[in-house]
Amino acid sequence: MNAYEGDTLNNHGKSSTRQHWRKRSAVSSSLEFSSYEESNSPIENTEVLKVSEIEAKKRRRKKHRYIYLAVCLFFLASVLSCAIIFRFYLHTNRENFSLFKNDSYKQKEPITVSHFGESIFLPYHQDIEWITSTEGTVLYYDQSTFSLSLFYPDGKEYGSNVDSLITSFVLTCKNLHRKRYSSDMEYIAFSCSKDRRWRHSYYEDVYLVERATGRIEHLASDQSKKIVVAEWSPIGHKLVYGLGSNLFIWESFSEPPVCITDQSDLDGLFNGNSDWVYEEEILQSSKAVWWSPDGNCLSYLSIDDSKVPVHVLPFEQLDSKVEDQNRVNNFFHYSTPKDPIPFVKLFVNCFTDSGESIEVDSSFPLSTQHRYITDVAWAGNEKLMFVEVLRGNYERVTSLFDLSSRKTTIENTEVSEHPLALTSSLHLKYLSFESLGNLKERYVRQYFLSNKKRIAIYELDNPVPIYLTPVNISFLSDLYLINNTLYFTAISSGSPFSRVYRLCTKSLILSEINIQIGSGLFGIKVSNDQNYLLVNYLGPEIPKQFIYSIHEDKVSTSNDHSKNNLPSDSSSTSLGKVKLELCNSLETNEELIITKEKFAFPSVFFKVIKVKNITAYIQEIRPPNFNPRKRYPTVFHLYGAPQSALVTGKYEMDINELMASVYNFLVIKVDIVDISDVSGQHLFSDSHELIIKSWIELLRSYVDTPYIDRHRVGIWGWSFGGYLTLKILENADFIKTGAVVAPVTDWRYYDAYYSENLLGAYSKQTTAIYDKTAVHYSENFRKLCGLLVLHGTSDDNVHIENTMQLTKAMVEKGVYNYYPFIVPNANHEFSDPTDYTFLREKLSGHFHHALYC
């Protein structure tokens, strides 16, 4: 019986010893064969042999199974590993594959560093001014061109073109600053910039052109003297201008100018124009003259800096033969917190009277040496309103001067134990209208409450303000008052973008003017008849300019407060509706739109975040083909000064955009808009440490964003932003590198008005505060992959002493990764094209290297 036949079957008819594979052929040895023959029990020997062979085969099969299983597992593991590696490579390099590429960037040209020096990414902008003809026609003109043309709102030219009258003059005025028509349109004043005075002003050559004849004459009889201020009267063509220390009134070519101050030209005496601190911090303009509405009177400030120390810039003209129009005065009067401040007086001169200037009495007769005059506004033609602030900003008084009685009365007094909210101009505006047969006099100004700028209205006999804007709207800029109607731009809570509003101060109807352009930053100018609105769309998309006609929907409201007392709060304000109709697409920047389609621009993303008690606006400038699954080296850009905004939505192609588009960085602008534990009235004196900690906590939290490479984080700032950057680097340990431009390092080196508004008047009681808020050495500086500091020797705002003191401290501590870079002749803005190009490339290049050190 063969092996198969000898198998036993179980009850199911299946062999209990049957194998599931075929047997191998076996060749027996002679020894095995002889043993088999000699066996007394052949069947028994055969069975033993079978069992032995089966066990051996089982062991071999088991061993083979392990080998096969190991090979299979190894193969599967290899395939899986390759798949994972390929998937990761595909994920991190998806922008290199056409399948995953963003179509909007597919054929676009990459941006290089050199492109930023060619101005091809900059928009065009027209400097439009409204004017009304003698017959009442609303017109406009561009202040930045030589053309004498005037235009209707729809863009059609008004009258005949007379540009040929000034063909030769164009060669005389090589650098036009601006042109201004007289209110009767008979004369044009051309201001030709010659030498820069300070940040906001130039010494100018002013030429007058008679529009009817083309006659051109230089305004100053002594052309060696430069003019700082030249302002037309609101009626007719009187022109006030400042020459040396005196003010003059020009009225016609046939009559000589009249001097209304008649003082000797003295260094440090400013009549009708600002000294340094008034220009930079208070009026934010070189102009310190105000015409009455009828043009018959003029008010002006007289500023005496004779007791204010002279600051000398470490200026070194490398080539005296080269004329530098961006050069500032190399010496000027400048008060720090330890110094006397300017002595200021307010005068009124009415040409219909004796012609003598009348000094306006101060509301602080015993403290005139320690006061600033921050606002001046005419209340009709017979009264003058003005605001005075005591040094340190602990007391602010609004007063009214009556020309007929020559008396000053106090209308409102604000007093605080701490400095009041930091402000320059309050945008003081006078209101008057008939109510129940009586003349109701009021005034409007901005008011700071809970870290927001609100618009408030006051009655002259009531010091309690009424807020005209809701608490969720913070006044921004462009405040126009026309016939008791206010036009302004503001931002609402939860968005960094501006909106345009109109507010009737008589009926208290607040209207949002809906502009069908998109969200972003807006600037406005309103025509004198309120029928036309110039809208400047400033970003984030390509800037544009439009002129609209204004139409109002009639709104039924019982909220007419002209016959009653004012409401207790703006909650009573009604909402009106305003329609706009497009008249003229003034500037669309089509060339820039085409350029943007050609090049791979960075993208911009805005959001609002909250970290514990901190609310902040964020603007991310993302590199082309931004991939949220990747991690990007990141640079934070900060400013952080009180009542300022960095995140505005303005279109820019500058340092941040260079780093994003050329070096593939993520650049993030940050504004903290609210810290619930910090008083909105004051920034530093009580809570400076908490504020710095809040900035650090916010940044530390944000670097955990998935697409930020937390090991490659940098930070930079300019001016106040430079100070904030240094304080963060002093106290934070998670930032790899930093860069600052013109930083404040100690508020005792900065101007008294700003510093004392932050920290209080300098005294024995406040010395500790000034010490604490200064920048101090920290071991965190030593751990950085480089700290770059850029400062110009001709910086009239933040003096180079700030950087010198910081450098001294770093040298004493042996901090070798500190890189100060002093730029000869550069001013605070690095406004010279060569200086700014160097700054842009040096700063961006620093981060390009330092974030990978």
Curated annotation (Swiss-Prot):
Lineage, top ranks: Eukaryota, Fungi, Dikarya, Ascomycota, Taphrinomycotina
Annotated protein name in UniProt: Putative dipeptidyl aminopeptidase C14C4.15c
GO MF terms, alphabetically ordered: aminopeptidase activity; dipeptidyl-peptidase activity; serine-type peptidase activity
Entry's EC annotation: 3.4.14.-
GO biological process: protein processing; proteolysis
InterPro entries attached to this UniProt entry: AB_hydrolase_fold, Peptidase_S9_cat, Peptidase_S9B_N, Serine_Prot_S9B/DPPIV
Localisation: Vacuole membrane
Transmembrane segments annotated in the record for this chain: 66-86
Similarity section: Belongs to the peptidase S9B family.
